[in-house]
């Protein structure tokens, strides 16, 4: 697929942006010995003429003593477009952080210090997952930071690691086994090189949280752990960083200089007192001794655009959309022509341009939502992190929608682990949907809905939600399932009579993300209270420790209880009603590709934001669905994704997909794309699979998996005469 905006982890784009800016900064800064009287003198005169930013700028000095970066086999240093690791993964960029696990892992440098003497007897001083620092050719150990420009080449992995460090600190004990790969590779002598140590990070932000520049002080030796990274030699680097941040700010906005600057280190503050005024910038009288941002401070979303062909960021080149479709961004005529003439023709922009132009016409339709915040969240410059933080949505399931990490002292919520659900539930299925303020979900209405809902407006009105509530972002998953059951299946498969079924078995395929939000599906029983539901989450991205788990959520008075699944399947199959005529919700987990799943045939299959062309297992799972021939509905985050899914379905099975239609229960949050301007929304469009007719379909026009020759075939003439005689004989008897 050419465009992966709706499928790629935002954090990877964020890391690629940081590294792209950092790589440009290192290239323009030159070697560390470059005198300030050189190129930076020329830059000073340019900066003095820049317009002034009224916001306060902050230079943060952030040491790191505990986390190291271990590069796996094949992780060779070298710059490349975006994340350097993408070069190791072929032409397709990585879509998830776990895609980098063979190349990058985290190691605890503190553990290495504490256990060094004990491990020395057994492993000659080597910790599990890391090797002893090797000396250079002359017998000298690698210098700590003098070789920083050379050491900067592996920075893409370092960048990801630095940003993940806080999450690693808070959830180390909760990581699955495959996340602790370095410990498993104990005894492999040539597994990986010495861990990189990012000793210090210099970060320039404004008072609103926009990141403007970054510098990494890295050394490859573990021996420096525990030592305070000295700031006596940081002044030239910090000054160069400030100059580059003003001339080429990483965040949004044109080049500018701050009205005032404050520094987070006392010694560095003194060193910069004579340098910063040369830029026409006022330095605060005293350093920022503690972290003291404004109450609403949060790092703003960074979504710098990139050229679709060369992947250069907007701070490197000027980007303009294609003049015909306005959908794809290019840095100039050369990249536009290269994309226009690509071979084969069906991947060229010449082929896709009119189609992308039609997709762009959906911008207004997809942004037509009833919420009070619609204009903000559907904007191309939507700052999602600031939106969530301003509403106190920084814990529970909300953390999975953004890159915000809970700070020290904040409650930790495990992700995607059914074993933790019992302690998290506490009788309230909406606990993980709450923010820091008042309850977001009102009590369940006493009466079930009397009509079917086909829009967020109707659902919010019945549920007692204000149109200012952002709950639609999480409830898009259960409401999409509800819409498929109540509207789309009756329209496309009326013979199933699904609305009259008392129990439904639904398979949710490739459901790694949806399983991490499993409690939102309780809303299905609120909307369909008289239907017994079984949701089976299937996919190899599910936690391996959750495989074959089975539990039931059941209403007990005003609360909801969670029970293991032993003996529950009988209740589901029998259709026994719970108290008040309500039924329970069963959850099953199968951590495997769908084509390897064994079990009863489902009533319905659903997949969210599937991206058939991005994962090879779909080439096996789609034929499996073809053989089952059950209604299978899928959502996509863009109309482009629907077209690619149709092509993949044709290749895998010879079938196709229905025409996609906008999902009225799509997420209101627009997904910002890096190399294009197309509208991307989670669950934006819905389609269903159109299966290839069975092999016997050409012989008989009547559909059906197994033909019955005796019934429709022309019977022998004598038999027809006998039936006629019988009918004639019966006629007079009836009249008498």
UniProtKB/Swiss-Prot annotation:
Tissue expression profile of the protein: Testis-specific. Expressed in pachytene spermatocytes and all developing spermatids, but not in Sertoli, nor Leydig cells (at protein level).
Record-listed Zn(2+) 2 binding positions: 322, 325, 349, 353
GO molecular function term, any single one: zinc ion binding
Region annotation Disordered: where it falls in the sequence: 70-94, 109-192, 556-583, 696-736
Extent of Acidic residues compositional bias: 110-123
Keyword Zinc: yes
Pro residues: bias regions: 704-718
Cellular component terms per the entry's GO annotation: cytoplasm; male germ cell nucleus
Zn finger (MYND-type) location: 307-353
Presence of keyword Transcription regulation: yes
Key words of the record: Cytoplasm, Differentiation, Metal-binding, Nucleus, Spermatogenesis, Transcription, Transcription regulation, Zinc, Zinc-finger
Superkingdom per UniProt: Eukaryota
Changes seen on gene knockout: Since CXCL16 and ZMYND15 genes overlap in their 5'UTRs, CXCL16 knockout also disrupts the ZMYND15 gene. The double knockout mice display severe depletion of late spermatids and are thus infertile. This phenotype is probably due to ZMYND15, rather than CXCL16, deficiency.
A Pfam family matched in the record: MSS51_C
InterPro entries, alphabetized: Mss51-like_C, ZMY15, Znf_MYND
Residues engaged in binding Zn(2+) 1: 307, 310, 331, 335
Composition skew (Basic residues), residue ranges: 719-736
Compositionally biased region (Basic and acidic residues): 124-135, 165-185
Location in or out of the cell: Nucleus; Cytoplasm
Function: Acts as a transcriptional repressor through interaction with histone deacetylases (HDACs). May regulate haploid genes important for spermiogenesis.
Subunit relationships: Interacts with HDAC1, HDAC3, HDAC6 and, to a lesser extent, with HDAC7.
Protein name as annotated: Zinc finger MYND domain-containing protein 15
Organism, as annotated: Mus musculus
Name of the gene encoding the protein in the UniProt record: Zmynd15
């Amino acid at each position: 697929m050419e465009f992966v905006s709706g499928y790629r982890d935002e954090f990877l784009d964020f890391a690629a942006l940081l590294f792209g800016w950092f790589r440009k900064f290192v290239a323009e800064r030159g070697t560390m010995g470059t005198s300030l009287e050189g190129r930076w003198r020329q830059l000073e005169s340019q900066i003095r003429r820049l317009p002034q930013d009224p916001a306060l700028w902050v230079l943060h000095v952030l040491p790191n003593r505990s986390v190291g970066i271990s590069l796996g086999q094949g992780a060779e240093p070298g710059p490349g477009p975006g994340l350097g690791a993408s070069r190791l993964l072929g032409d397709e960029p990585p879509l998830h952080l776990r895609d980098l696990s063979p190349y990058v892992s985290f190691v605890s440098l503190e553990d290495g210090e504490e256990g060094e003497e004990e491990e020395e007897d057994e492993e000659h001083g080597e910790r599990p997952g890391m090797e002893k620092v090797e000396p250079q050719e002359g017998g000298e150990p690698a210098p700590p930071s003098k070789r920083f420009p050379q050491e900067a080449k592996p920075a893409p992995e370092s960048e990801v690691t630095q940003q993940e460090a806080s999450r690693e600190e808070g959830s180390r004990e909760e990581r699955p086994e495959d996340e602790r790969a370095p410990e498993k590779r104990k005894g492999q002598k040539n597994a990986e090189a010495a861990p990189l140590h990012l000793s210090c990070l210099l970060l320039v932000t404004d008072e609103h949280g926009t990141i403007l520049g970054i510098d990494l002080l890295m050394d490859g030796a573990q021996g420096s752990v525990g030592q305070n990274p000295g700031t006596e030699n940081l002044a030239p680097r910090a000054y160069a960083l400030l100059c580059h941040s003003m001339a080429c700010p990483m965040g949004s906005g044109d080049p500018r200089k701050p009205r005032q600057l404050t520094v987070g280190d006392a010694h560095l503050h003194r060193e910069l007192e004579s340098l910063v005024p040369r830029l026409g910038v006022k330095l605060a009288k005293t350093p920022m001794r503690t972290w003291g941002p404004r109450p609403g401070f949060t790092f703003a979303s960074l979504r710098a655009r990139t050229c679709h062909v060369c992947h250069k960021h907007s701070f490197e080149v000027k980007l303009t959309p294609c003049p015909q479709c306005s959908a794809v961004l290019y840095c100039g005529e050369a990249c536009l022509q290269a994309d226009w003439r690509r071979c084969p023709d069906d991947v060229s922009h010449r082929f896709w341009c009119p189609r992308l132009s039609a997709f762009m016409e959906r911008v207004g339709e997809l942004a037509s939502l009833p919420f009070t915040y619609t204009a903000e969240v559907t904007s191309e410059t939507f700052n999602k992190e600031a939106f969530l933080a301003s509403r106190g949505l920084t814990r529970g399931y909300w953390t999975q929608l953004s890159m915000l990490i809970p700070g020290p002292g904040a409650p930790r919520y495990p992700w995607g682990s059914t074993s933790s659900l019992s302690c998290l539930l506490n009788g309230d299925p909406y606990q993980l949907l709450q923010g820091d303020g008042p309850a977001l979900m009102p009590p369940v209405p006493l009466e079930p809905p009397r009509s079917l809902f086909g829009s967020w407006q109707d659902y919010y009105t019945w549920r007692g939600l204000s149109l200012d509530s952002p709950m639609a972002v999480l409830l898009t998953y259960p409401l999409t399932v509800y819409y498929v059951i109540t509207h789309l299946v009756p329209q496309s498969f009326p013979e199933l009579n699904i609305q009259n079924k008392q129990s439904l078995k639904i398979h949710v395929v490739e459901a790694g993300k949806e399983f991490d939000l499993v409690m939102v599906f309780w809303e299905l029983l609120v909307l369909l209270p008289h239907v017994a539901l079984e949701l089976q989450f299937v996919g190899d991205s599910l936690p391996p420790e959750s495989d074959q788990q089975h539990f039931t959520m059941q209403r007990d008075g005003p609360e909801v209880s969670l029970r293991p699944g032993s003996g529950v399947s009988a209740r589901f199959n029998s259709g026994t009603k719970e108290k008040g005529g309500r039924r329970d919700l069963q959850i099953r987990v199968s951590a495997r590709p769908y084509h390897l799943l064994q079990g009863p045939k489902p009533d319905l299959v659903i997949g969210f934001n599937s991206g058939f062309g991005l994962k090879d297992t779909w080439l096996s799972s789609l034929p499996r669905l073809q053989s089952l021939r059950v209604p299978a509905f899928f959502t996509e985050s863009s109309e482009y994704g629907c077209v690619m899914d149709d092509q993949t379905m044709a290749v895998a099975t010879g079938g196709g997909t229905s025409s996609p239609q906008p999902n009225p229960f799509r997420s209101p949050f627009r997904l910002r794309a890096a190399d294009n301007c197309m509208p991307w929304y989670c669950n934006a469009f819905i389609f269903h699979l159109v299966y290839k007719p069975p092999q016997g379909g050409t012989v008989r026009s009547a559909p059906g998996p197994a033909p019955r020759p005796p019934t429709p075939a022309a019977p022998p003439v004598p038999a027809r005469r006998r039936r006629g005689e019988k009918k004639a004989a019966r006629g007079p008897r009836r009249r008498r």
